[in-house]
């Protein structure tokens, strides 16, 4: 019997091992095929880009010739003798060509016409690395020549050393050398290949540089916003550098995060970023911010990079990159007939800030010659005393007295926790949605690790349906109706209120937290999550 059991166990182990190996082999083959398809696709995409470039180039030349024909015809309109030497067919063709003028669709070459002169203008002049694709996160690290000190090596060590072996396989760091002096570029590449040979050979690190023909003439730029000529040139070139880097990185991963060459990072930064993005997978965000400084730590979904690059190309000479990003959000969601607060609420759903910051700026000497910048992110070392969620755009208000600037508005958008002086009966916290929302669940958490006793007590959760008079409700739900039309759907227990919303009450116009009895303690609200129903 023991022998038989042992034989059965051996057979089971063999079958399991065989199936596992078969599955792994099939998975590996599938992965290799996917990588091969991706390479073929990107090669085809590059051939199409070159073909488009040549077509536009020929189109530009033909338009120039047609314009010359039009001028010639205009100049000879009063002279029949000038056209006597042309055949009837030629005259007919000239008439057709000069009378028809097709509409031209603007594209990148409209804003940067110099790119048509060289089909290699959008191809890196230097490209080092394996060309890894299919990762979760692509990190873009632009660097330029600094007269005093370079921080690039320290930055890369900080980014690499805080990755686990598994994380190193799920990302790629693209170093963009924004210089056209090939001697300088090659020196930087040689230095990086020596210092980070393992990372480059494994595909984790890539190094690129743009061709000189990528840049337009930057000598006659209009001075704006009180900036000097040199600063305008610096910020204009910086915009172009960001665009080239983003275009190169777009096809490599799911997300693209913009970094700089003079930063340090926190431990576990990669998993924190990835998990935060996955938590927001069902939300319609455009920018996730992991630092409050400039363009550092701004993450985008790869499909959105096309819009961002196009927008920057349109206005690259006008404003710095962080201002242009804010304008994109304004164009997408702000109503000119509404006030600034309404606009900020709408933008906060597209631009979501993670705290505390994961990246700290350490460079003292700017890439702009002679500029000293003592910029540091004050949120870098702060402990996280609140939780971040994306909530429906809403106007928030409260009767409670706010303590030391810990406002309800900041809490609702995930920037801070709300802290108020002792609540009394009749006090309220109100969330009035900009438009009615179908709500699935809610969560309100009071207190925090530093002040665990500052919780909401004797407080109820109430909702106001949008179609209050037309509701078809069960008797149980009807009994929850209050005199002012709100429905009491929950209450705080041990500082927490959470639950679901009866679907028959949807859509909801407002959420309200109502204090029923005087409290003996102050109140902190450190987490607000009003979860919309998914379609």
Swiss-Prot record:
First-listed, main subcellular location of the protein, grouped into a coarse class: Golgi
Cofactor dependency: a divalent metal cation
GO molecular function, one term: alpha-1,3-mannosylglycoprotein 4-beta-N-acetylglucosaminyltransferase activity
Enzyme class: transferase
Parts forming coiled coils: 28-54
Keyword terms, alphabetized: Coiled coil, Glycoprotein, Glycosyltransferase, Golgi apparatus, Membrane, Metal-binding, Secreted, Signal-anchor, Transferase, Transmembrane, Transmembrane helix
Signal peptide bounds: none
EC numbers: 2.4.1.145
Top-level taxon: Eukaryota
GO cellular component: endoplasmic reticulum; endoplasmic reticulum-Golgi intermediate compartment; extracellular region; Golgi membrane; Golgi stack; peroxisome
Cytoplasmic-side segments: 1-6
Membrane topology: Single-pass type II membrane protein
Residues carrying covalently attached carbohydrate according to the record: 77, 85, 458
Assigned protein family: Belongs to the glycosyltransferase 54 family.
Described function: Glycosyltransferase that catalyze the transfer of GlcNAc from UDP-GlcNAc to the GlcNAcbeta1-2Manalpha1-3 arm of the core structure of N-linked glycans through a beta1-4 linkage and participates in the production of tri- and tetra-antennary N-linked sugar chains. Involved in glucose transport by mediating SLC2A2/GLUT2 glycosylation, thereby controlling cell-surface expression of SLC2A2 in pancreatic beta cells.
Name under which the protein is recorded: Alpha-1,3-mannosyl-glycoprotein 4-beta-N-acetylglucosaminyltransferase A
């Amino acid at each position: 019997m023991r022998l038989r059991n042992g034989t059965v166990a051996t057979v089971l182990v063999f079958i399991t091992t065989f199936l596992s190996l078969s599955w792994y082999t099939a998975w590996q083959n599938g992965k290799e095929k996917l990588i091969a398809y991706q390479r073929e696709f990107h090669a085809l995409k590059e051939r199409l880009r070159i073909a488009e470039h040549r077509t536009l180039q020929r189109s530009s030349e033909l338009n120039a010739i047609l314009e010359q024909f039009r001028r010639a015809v205009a100049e000879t309109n009063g002279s029949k003798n000038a056209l006597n030497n042309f055949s009837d067919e030629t005259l007919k063709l000239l008439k057709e060509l000069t009378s028809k003028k097709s509409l031209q669709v603007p594209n990148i070459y409209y804003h940067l016409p110099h790119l048509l002169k060289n089909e290699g203008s959008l191809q890196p002049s230097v490209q080092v690395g394996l060309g890894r694709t299919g990762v979760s996160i692509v990190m873009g690290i632009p660097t330029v020549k600094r007269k005093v000190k370079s921080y690039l090596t320290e930055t890369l060590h900080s980014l690499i050393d805080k990755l686990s072996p598994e994380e190193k396989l799920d990302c790629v760091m693209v170093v963009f050398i924004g210089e056209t002096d090939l001697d300088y570029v090659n020196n930087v590449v040689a230095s990086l290949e020596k210092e980070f040979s393992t990372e480059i050979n494994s595909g984790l690190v890539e190094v690129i540089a743009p061709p000189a023909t990528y840049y337009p003439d930057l000598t006659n730029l209009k001075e704006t916003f009180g900036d000097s000529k040199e600063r305008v040139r610096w910020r204009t070139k910086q915009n172009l550098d960001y665009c080239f880097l983003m275009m190169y990185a777009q096809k490599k991963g799911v997300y693209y995060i913009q970094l700089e060459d003079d930063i340090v990072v926190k431990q576990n930064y990669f998993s924190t970023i990835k998990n935060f993005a996955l938590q927001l997978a069902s939300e319609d965000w455009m920018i996730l911010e992991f630092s409050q400084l400039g363009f550092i730590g701004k993450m985008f979904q790869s499909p959105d990079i096309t819009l961002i690059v196009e927008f920057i190309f349109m206005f690259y000479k006008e404003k710095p990159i962080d201002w242009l990003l804010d304008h994109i959000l304004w164009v997408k969601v702000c109503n000119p007939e509404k006030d600034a607060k309404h606009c900020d609420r709408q933008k906060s759903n597209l631009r979501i800030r993670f705290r505390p910051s994961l990246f700290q700026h350490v460079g003292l000497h700017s890439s702009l010659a002679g500029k000293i910048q003592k910029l540091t992110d004050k949120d870098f070392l702060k402990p996280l005393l609140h939780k971040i969620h994306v909530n429906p755009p809403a106007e928030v208000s409260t009767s409670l007295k706010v303590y030391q600037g810990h406002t309800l508005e900041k809490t609702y958008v995930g920037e801070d926790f709300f802290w108020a002086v002792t609540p009394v009966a009749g006090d309220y916290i109100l969330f009035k949605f900009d438009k009615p929302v179908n709500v699935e669940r809610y969560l309100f958490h009071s207190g925090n690790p530093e002040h665990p006793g500052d919780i909401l007590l004797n407080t109820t959760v109430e909702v106001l349906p949008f179609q209050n008079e037309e509701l078809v409700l069960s008797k149980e739900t009807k009994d929850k109706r209050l005199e002012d039309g709100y429905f009491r759907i929950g209450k705080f227990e041990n500082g927490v209120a959470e639950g679901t919303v009866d679907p028959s009450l949807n859509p909801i116009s407002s959420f309200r937290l109502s204090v029923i009895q005087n409290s003996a303690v102050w109140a902190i609200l450190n987490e607000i999550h009003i979860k919309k129903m998914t379609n």
